[in-house]
C-alpha cells in the first residue's frame, strides 16, 4: 500500500500515494501534496 498524507517517507524511495498527488518531501521526510 502507498503512504498517505503526513506519513513518514524516504525521498529516495518515494512510496507516497501518487493517485492522491502526494510526494515525499526532501526537506521534511513526510508525504505532502504536490501542488
UniProtKB/Swiss-Prot annotation:
Its main location: secreted. It is found in: Secreted. The keyword 4Fe-4S does not apply. Expressed by the venom gland. Disulfide bonds join 2-17, 9-24, 16-31. It comes from the Eukaryota. The keyword Glycoprotein does not apply. Keywords: Disulfide bond, Ion channel impairing toxin, Knottin, Neurotoxin, Secreted, Toxin, Voltage-gated sodium channel impairing toxin. Belongs to the neurotoxin 10 (Hwtx-1) family. 10 (haplotoxin-1) subfamily. Potently inhibits Nav1.7/SCN9A (IC(50)=98.1 nM), and moderately inhibits Nav1.2/SCN2A (IC(50)=216.3 nM), Nav1.6/SCN8A (IC(50)=313.6 nM), and Nav1.3/SCN3A (IC(50)=491.3 nM). Hyperpolarizes the slow inactivation, but does not alter the voltage-dependent activation or fast inactivation of Nav1.7/SCN9A. Binds with Nav1.7/SCN9A at the extracellular S3-S4 linker of domain II (site 4). In vivo, exhibits dose-dependent analgesic efficacy by reducing pain responses in rodent models of formalin-induced paw licking, hot plate test, and acetic acid-induced writhing. Negative results: has no effect on Nav1.4/SCN4A, Nav1.5/SCN5A, Nav1.8/SCN10A, and Nav1.9/SCN11A (IC(50)>10 uM). The presence of a 'disulfide through disulfide knot' structurally defines this protein as a knottin. This is Mu-theraphotoxin-Ca2a.
Amino acid at each position: 500500500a502507498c503512504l498517505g498524507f503526513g506519513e513518514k517517507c524516504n525521498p529516495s524511495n518515494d512510496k507516497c500515494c501518487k493517485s492522491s498527488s502526494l510526494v515525499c518531501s526532501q526537506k521534511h521526510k513526510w508525504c505532502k501534496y504536490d501542488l
